[in-house]
Amino acid sequence: MRLRLSKLTVALAIAFASSLALPPGEIAAETCISPYIKSLTQPEKVMYLWALPATPGGGEDFLAVIDVNLASATYGQVLKKVGAGSVGNEAHHIGYTDDRTKLWAASLNSDRFFIFDVATDPMNPKLIKVIDNVGKLTGLTGPHTPYAIPGRILVSMASGANGKGPGGLAEFTNDGKFIASHAATNHPYETVVKPEFNRMITSAWFPQETWMKPLSQWDPSTWSNPNTMLVWDLKERKIIQTLTAPDAVMLAARWALKPGAKYGYNISNAGNSIWMFKLKDDGTFDYRKAADVGAGCGPADLRQSPDDKYLYVSCFVRSEIQAWDISDPENIKLHDTIQGVVQPNMMHVTYDGRRLYFTNSAISSIDYSPRYSMQLVQIGHDGRLKLDPNFKIDFAKAPAGPARPHDMLLN
């Protein structure tokens, strides 16, 4: 899995690496991760990408280590793969601990957690712990997103016992000791917090029993409140408000980054829309539709720029990536699009807001193209998007067999 880079391309990349200083007045911040995590404040050098074999049972899930250092001679190459040691996990989302020393990786189907040491040697992460009995420990199934809070990890769990019914949040120490489960009234997908307001919001999708079936057998009537967002008291881990929309499957959510910002956004997959949540003076939240992303988009992920000027939406069904201008938070506008990128799913924006990496596998049961890859979009100072023609890792032609790349983190 190598990029075909000419000597000229490498030379240009190295030259570009030396010019990554931000222009005066621009903001740098790592986005779309917990505010408790020690932030990356310099250009990325390595990417960790959590992936699974394209064919069920075709091998173990793995953490790919990718060189993304523009000044490196191995830029754009998969340096190694760290195996999970088991099959059938359905590798999905990953998250750092607050001190950025460990990476937690969740598995949708097997209810396992994999903990990697990424601090001792960042270029050579090591699998140091596997938690096998998550369902028995927590009473919850379908682990989705590991999210850092001080000294602990909260994992959004989609469903209850046996993959059915509402899920909740499972709380662990950074080392993997189970603390408690916190029941939800829907199927938690993602978590975002705003510590200054003592508020946490979780979005929703569907239970584990759904995605483990072929798409033709999915039954939305078995889903619990998939059109809701839950507002929690962060310290008490208690639900204090339910935000409801007519559209179902409220996936990725992002809180505005600016200190004191009382608003944020999430996407509705079934409703092809962006929604805005906003904290009012009385402590409750307003919730309204902010924009339609277009019929047939099938929004899968939502990311933001470090300066709160742009949102990025991946349209999994329509094969495009959208940039939305949110400089006026109450009146957001479509700013730019890239089309023809096959089933884009997870994205990651760099600390300087100039690069957006994306993968193109969602879940084994709904992927519709076998052209699996990880690609890069360059973001101009004007917010315009341009697909980088020199950066593409073809996971469909991986040496050990085709693989589905899902979530990624930079270091």
Annotate each PLM feature.
Residues 75-147:
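Blade-loop segments of beta-propeller domains
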Residues 121-196:
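Asp-box/WD-like beta-propeller blade repeats and closely related beta-sheet repeat scaffolds
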Residues 66-74, 115-125, 234-237, 276-285, ...:
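Short loop/turn segments immediately following beta-strands, especially the blade-tip
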Residues 41, 49-57, 156-165, 203-226, ...:
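Short, conserved, GDST-rich strand-edge loop motifs in beta-rich repeat architectures
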Residues 29-68, 74-108:
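Beta-strand-rich domains and repeat architectures in extracellular enzymes and scaffolds
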Residues 31-38, 85-98, 136-152, 185-199, ...:
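Beta-rich, blade/repeat-based domains predominating
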Residues 97, 185, 194-322:
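Beta-propeller domains
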